[in-house]
Amino acid sequence: MTMVNIINGPNLGRLGRREPDVYGSTTHEQLSALIERAAVEFGIKAVVRQSDSESQLLDWIHLAADAGEPVILNAGGLTHTSVALRDACAELSAPFIEVHISNVHAREEFRRHSYLSPLATGVITGLGVQGYLLALRYLAEIAGN
Protein backbone atom coordinates (compact mmCIF):
# COMPACT_ATOMS: atom_id res chain seq x y z
CA MET A 1 0.00 0.00 0.00
CA THR A 2 1.35 3.41 -0.98
CA MET A 3 2.48 5.62 1.91
CA VAL A 4 2.23 9.38 1.30
CA ASN A 5 4.02 11.87 3.52
CA ILE A 6 2.19 15.17 4.01
CA ILE A 7 4.65 17.66 5.46
CA ASN A 8 3.59 21.10 6.62
CA GLY A 9 6.06 23.79 7.58
CA PRO A 10 6.20 26.90 9.72
CA ASN A 11 2.97 28.49 10.94
CA LEU A 12 0.73 25.83 9.41
CA GLY A 13 0.00 24.52 12.88
CA ARG A 14 -1.84 27.83 13.34
CA LEU A 15 -4.34 27.19 10.55
CA GLY A 16 -7.80 28.40 11.48
CA ARG A 17 -6.34 31.09 13.75
CA ARG A 18 -3.68 32.79 11.63
CA GLU A 19 -5.06 35.07 8.89
CA PRO A 20 -8.29 33.11 8.28
CA ASP A 21 -9.14 35.55 5.49
CA VAL A 22 -6.07 34.22 3.63
CA TYR A 23 -5.81 30.61 4.83
CA GLY A 24 -9.41 29.77 5.75
CA SER A 25 -10.99 28.57 8.97
CA THR A 26 -9.92 24.91 8.82
CA THR A 27 -7.53 24.06 11.65
CA HIS A 28 -4.49 21.84 11.16
CA GLU A 29 -6.21 19.15 13.20
CA GLN A 30 -9.25 19.30 10.90
CA LEU A 31 -6.98 19.26 7.83
CA SER A 32 -5.21 16.16 9.15
CA ALA A 33 -8.55 14.42 9.67
CA LEU A 34 -9.70 15.34 6.14
CA ILE A 35 -6.49 13.94 4.68
CA GLU A 36 -6.66 10.74 6.73
CA ARG A 37 -10.29 10.10 5.67
CA ALA A 38 -9.43 10.76 2.02
CA ALA A 39 -6.43 8.42 2.19
CA VAL A 40 -8.68 5.58 3.38
CA GLU A 41 -11.13 6.36 0.57
CA PHE A 42 -8.29 6.36 -1.99
CA GLY A 43 -6.80 3.11 -0.67
CA ILE A 44 -3.49 4.57 0.47
CA LYS A 45 -1.79 5.39 3.76
CA ALA A 46 -0.99 8.96 4.73
CA VAL A 47 0.99 10.45 7.55
CA VAL A 48 0.47 14.16 8.27
CA ARG A 49 3.25 16.06 9.99
CA GLN A 50 3.78 19.71 10.89
CA SER A 51 6.76 21.52 12.34
CA ASP A 52 7.98 25.08 12.65
CA SER A 53 11.54 23.70 12.60
CA GLU A 54 13.39 23.56 9.29
CA SER A 55 15.62 20.85 10.75
CA GLN A 56 12.61 18.62 11.44
CA LEU A 57 11.24 19.16 7.92
CA LEU A 58 14.61 18.15 6.49
CA ASP A 59 14.63 14.98 8.60
CA TRP A 60 11.14 14.00 7.36
CA ILE A 61 12.06 14.66 3.72
CA HIS A 62 15.24 12.59 4.12
CA LEU A 63 13.18 9.71 5.56
CA ALA A 64 10.77 9.88 2.60
CA ALA A 65 13.68 10.01 0.16
CA ASP A 66 15.33 6.98 1.77
CA ALA A 67 12.03 5.05 1.68
CA GLY A 68 11.18 6.10 -1.89
CA GLU A 69 7.84 7.51 -0.71
CA PRO A 70 5.86 10.38 -2.28
CA VAL A 71 5.61 13.73 -0.53
CA ILE A 72 3.01 16.48 -0.43
CA LEU A 73 4.85 19.52 0.92
CA ASN A 74 3.61 22.89 2.07
CA ALA A 75 6.82 24.45 3.33
CA GLY A 76 5.14 27.74 4.22
CA GLY A 77 7.56 30.66 4.21
CA LEU A 78 10.54 28.31 3.77
CA THR A 79 9.35 27.78 0.20
CA HIS A 80 10.76 31.18 -0.67
CA THR A 81 13.96 31.09 1.37
CA SER A 82 15.37 27.62 2.01
CA VAL A 83 18.08 26.26 -0.22
CA ALA A 84 18.57 23.45 2.31
CA LEU A 85 14.95 22.36 1.85
CA ARG A 86 15.38 22.54 -1.92
CA ASP A 87 18.47 20.34 -1.72
CA ALA A 88 16.64 17.78 0.44
CA CYS A 89 13.74 17.68 -2.05
CA ALA A 90 16.23 17.06 -4.85
CA GLU A 91 16.85 13.64 -3.24
CA LEU A 92 13.21 12.57 -3.61
CA SER A 93 12.78 9.90 -6.27
CA ALA A 94 9.02 9.42 -5.80
CA PRO A 95 6.55 12.12 -6.87
CA PHE A 96 6.61 15.32 -4.88
CA ILE A 97 3.70 17.78 -4.94
CA GLU A 98 4.13 21.34 -3.68
CA VAL A 99 0.91 22.70 -2.15
CA HIS A 100 -0.04 26.20 -1.01
CA ILE A 101 -3.40 27.04 0.52
CA SER A 102 -3.38 30.62 -0.74
CA ASN A 103 -2.58 31.78 -4.27
CA VAL A 104 1.01 32.84 -3.66
CA HIS A 105 1.13 34.47 -7.10
CA ALA A 106 -1.62 36.92 -6.13
CA ARG A 107 0.17 37.99 -2.95
CA GLU A 108 3.39 39.83 -2.11
CA GLU A 109 6.21 39.70 -4.63
CA PHE A 110 8.53 37.75 -2.31
CA ARG A 111 6.00 34.89 -2.16
CA ARG A 112 6.07 34.39 -5.92
CA HIS A 113 9.47 32.69 -5.95
CA SER A 114 9.74 29.05 -4.92
CA TYR A 115 12.99 27.16 -4.54
CA LEU A 116 10.89 23.98 -4.63
CA SER A 117 8.69 24.33 -7.72
CA PRO A 118 11.39 23.46 -10.27
CA LEU A 119 11.83 20.10 -8.51
CA ALA A 120 8.16 19.31 -7.89
CA THR A 121 6.15 16.88 -9.97
CA GLY A 122 3.34 19.42 -9.71
CA VAL A 123 2.29 22.54 -7.84
CA ILE A 124 -1.19 23.25 -6.47
CA THR A 125 -1.77 26.78 -5.22
CA GLY A 126 -4.74 28.86 -4.19
CA LEU A 127 -7.35 26.09 -3.83
CA GLY A 128 -7.46 26.14 -0.04
CA VAL A 129 -7.17 22.89 1.87
CA GLN A 130 -8.74 21.11 -1.13
CA GLY A 131 -5.30 21.35 -2.73
CA TYR A 132 -4.04 18.64 -0.37
CA LEU A 133 -6.90 16.33 -1.32
CA LEU A 134 -6.29 16.90 -5.03
CA ALA A 135 -2.60 16.08 -4.55
CA LEU A 136 -3.49 12.97 -2.56
CA ARG A 137 -5.96 11.81 -5.22
CA TYR A 138 -3.32 12.29 -7.93
CA LEU A 139 -0.75 10.26 -6.00
CA ALA A 140 -3.29 7.49 -5.37
CA GLU A 141 -4.22 7.37 -9.05
CA ILE A 142 -0.65 7.15 -10.32
CA ALA A 143 0.01 4.42 -7.75
CA GLY A 144 -2.85 2.46 -9.31
CA ASN A 145 -5.28 2.75 -6.40
From Swiss-Prot:
<dbReference type="InterPro" id="IPR001874">
    <property type="entry name" value="DHquinase_II"/>
</dbReference>
<dbReference type="GO" id="GO:0008652">
    <property type="term" value="P:amino acid biosynthetic process"/>
</dbReference>
<dbReference type="GO" id="GO:0009423">
    <property type="term" value="P:chorismate biosynthetic process"/>
</dbReference>
<feature type="binding site">
    <location>
        <position position="74"/>
    </location>
    <ligand>
        <name>substrate</name>
    </ligand>
</feature>
<dbReference type="GO" id="GO:0009073">
    <property type="term" value="P:aromatic amino acid family biosynthetic process"/>
</dbReference>
<dbReference type="GO" id="GO:0003855">
    <property type="term" value="F:3-dehydroquinate dehydratase activity"/>
</dbReference>
<protein>
    <recommendedName>
        <fullName>3-dehydroquinate dehydratase</fullName>
        <ecNumber>4.2.1.10</ecNumber>
    </recommendedName>
</protein>
<feature type="binding site">
    <location>
        <position position="87"/>
    </location>
    <ligand>
        <name>substrate</name>
    </ligand>
</feature>
<keyword id="KW-0456">Lyase</keyword>
<feature type="active site" description="Proton acceptor">
    <location>
        <position position="23"/>
    </location>
</feature>
<comment type="function">
    <text>Catalyzes a trans-dehydration via an enolate intermediate.</text>
</comment>
<feature type="active site" description="Proton donor">
    <location>
        <position position="100"/>
    </location>
</feature>
<dbReference type="Pfam" id="PF01220">
    <property type="entry name" value="DHquinase_II"/>
</dbReference>
<feature type="binding site">
    <location>
        <position position="111"/>
    </location>
    <ligand>
        <name>substrate</name>
    </ligand>
</feature>
<dbReference type="InterPro" id="IPR036441">
    <property type="entry name" value="DHquinase_II_sf"/>
</dbReference>
<comment type="subunit">
    <text>Homododecamer.</text>
</comment>
<keyword id="KW-0028">Amino-acid biosynthesis</keyword>
<feature type="binding site">
    <location>
        <position position="80"/>
    </location>
    <ligand>
        <name>substrate</name>
    </ligand>
</feature>
<dbReference type="InterPro" id="IPR018509">
    <property type="entry name" value="DHquinase_II_CS"/>
</dbReference>
<keyword id="KW-0057">Aromatic amino acid biosynthesis</keyword>
<dbReference type="GO" id="GO:0019631">
    <property type="term" value="P:quinate catabolic process"/>
</dbReference>
<comment type="similarity">
    <text>Belongs to the type-II 3-dehydroquinase family.</text>
</comment>
<comment type="pathway">
    <text>Metabolic intermediate biosynthesis; chorismate biosynthesis; chorismate from D-erythrose 4-phosphate and phosphoenolpyruvate: step 3/7.</text>
</comment>
<feature type="binding site">
    <location>
        <begin position="101"/>
        <end position="102"/>
    </location>
    <ligand>
        <name>substrate</name>
    </ligand>
</feature>
<feature type="site" description="Transition state stabilizer">
    <location>
        <position position="18"/>
    </location>
</feature>
